Amino acid sequence: MRVQDVYNVIYTHTEGEPLCIIYSGVPYPAGSTILEKRAFLEENYDWLRKALMREPRGHADMFGVFLTPPSSRDYDAGLIYIDGKEYSHMCGHGTIAVAMAMVANGLVARDPSGLTRIRFETTAGLVVAEVAHEGDRVLWTRFENVPAYVAAQDIAFELPGYGPLKADLVWGGNYFGIIDLRGTSLRIAPENGSELSRMGLIAREEIRKKVKVQHPTEAHINNLNFVTFWHEPTIEGCLYKNVHVFSAGQLDRSPGGTGTSAMMAYFEARGVIGLNQPITSEGLLGSGTFEGCLIGETTLGTVRAVRPTVKGTAGMLGTASWTINREDPVDAGFLVL
């Protein structure tokens, strides 16, 4: 065995959804934008994504982020989100977790007021997080996400075994195909994970056939990667219960941060909620929630959009210093699907 590379990471979870924060070891090009940093990673360090997200260090549902230096004084840090298959434009559960981890581990200076503000550069745009802390305790993160909007409504498709359904295409930091399961027999619960994953991938392909995806102002954003199933909540006080199916069929354990942003835009467009009306969202596990609110309107080019905020908590799981032998194909990462 010959150790070729060593990388330090922090592990967290946000209402059950994991995050591997890669904060050292990558020599990002000086002065590069976040898109240039992602291209650099794709070309030179995609092996690291695979090694940390996949087995034997990760698993099929692992999620991660490269915490990068800022590209300008307008930002405090950059975030490039990853999983075992690909890259994501943004991630809300990850933003909650990485912001809390940065404050807890001294990766950012704490504001004496007890509320530390962190400006993140993502490939979806500027995301501003506020982390509340008291003494040694880090309490919660609230972030203002990129603007959200509804791109298309009532996209008809057939879901095998569950009949004809409709989806809305909504941007909330990623594009989501949002599907109402009320009236079907499919329930959102951990014991139904395999079926939810399978149906999510089928639904995503059906929606992709029906609509062209293109962000109004960001030319590089043109993909539908997430499908959200929702129905009535099981936790009192929540507006809905949902699960987000993404990438190779992963299931988000948390209520979803970009997902909560998209769901608020979805419900606002349908007249269910209004601006400045707080909501609570429930995730797959039925144990944790996020708080959300649309704090105003804006535009994306000529398209009306809303400004979502999401609040949640994350827990520290531990740290690791990984050695990686790229000459060993198993050590370099594999998936069993």
From Swiss-Prot:
GO terms for molecular function: 4-hydroxyproline epimerase activity. Disruption phenotype: Cells lacking this gene loss their ability to grow on t4LHyp as a sole carbon source. It holds the Pfam family Pro_racemase. The keyword rRNA processing does not apply. It is an enzyme of class 5 (isomerase). It catalyses: trans-4-hydroxy-L-proline = cis-4-hydroxy-D-proline. SUPFAM superfamilies: Diaminopimelate epimerase-like (SSF54506). The active site is at C91 (proton acceptor). Catalyzes the epimerization of trans-4-hydroxy-L-proline (t4LHyp) to cis-4-hydroxy-D-proline (c4DHyp). Is involved in a degradation pathway that converts t4LHyp to alpha-ketoglutarate, which allows R.sphaeroides to grow on t4LHyp as a sole carbon source. Displays no proline racemase activity. This is 4-hydroxyproline 2-epimerase. It comes from Cereibacter sphaeroides (strain ATCC 17023 / DSM 158 / JCM 6121 / CCUG 31486 / LMG 2827 / NBRC 12203 / NCIMB 8253 / ATH 2.4.1.) (Rhodobacter sphaeroides).
